[in-house]
Amino acid sequence: MQLTSFTDYALRTLIYLASLPKDELTNITEVTDLFGVSRNHMVKVINRLGQLGYVHTVRGKNGGIRLMKAPQEITVGGVVRDLEPLDLVNCSVEFCHITPACRLKEKLAKAKLAFLAELDDCTIEELLSDNSELLILLARP
C-alpha cells in the first residue's frame, strides 16, 4: 500500500512539530523549507491537520502552528485513517463482473487491517523517542 504525498507530508509535519519544545510555534515557511515541499501544498496539509484537531494554527504576525494533541496521543494509524482513501480496489458489481465470486476483496481487507493495526501501535512520540539522528536532522539552523 502506498500513502499519498499528502499523508506523507502530514506525518512529516507532525513529527517535526513534535520535535519542537512544547507549545512552541513554527511557521509554514520553516516546514516547507525543511522538507522541500511547495507552500501551496503545505498550506492544504496544515489546514486539514487543523480541521482534524492535530494542529493549532495562530494567525497574525506572531502566529504559526503547533501540535494540538500530545505526540503520545497521535497514532500513525489514526492519521492514515483520517487522510487516506483506504479502499484498495473498486469491487462494485458495476466495475467488476467477478465481484460476486471473488475472494480477493476479503484478502485485501485483511491485509489493510493488518497494515493499520501495525500503524496503530506507533505514535508520533515513538518515532522521535531515542532517535537522536532524527532530532539532529530536524533541528533548526
UniProtKB/Swiss-Prot annotation:
Residues 2-129 form the HTH rrf2-type domain. GO terms for cellular component: cytosol. GO terms for biological process: negative regulation of DNA-templated transcription. It holds the Pfam family Rrf2. It comes from the Bacteria. SUPFAM superfamilies: Winged helix' DNA-binding domain. Keywords: 2Fe-2S, DNA-binding, Iron, Iron-sulfur, Metal-binding, Repressor, Transcription, Transcription regulation. One of its GO terms (molecular function) is DNA-binding transcription factor activity. Nitric oxide-sensitive repressor of genes involved in protecting the cell against nitrosative stress. May require iron for activity. PANTHER family: HTH-TYPE TRANSCRIPTIONAL REPRESSOR NSRR (PTHR33221:SF4), WINGED HELIX-TURN-HELIX TRANSCRIPTIONAL REGULATOR, RRF2 FAMILY (PTHR33221). This is HTH-type transcriptional repressor NsrR.
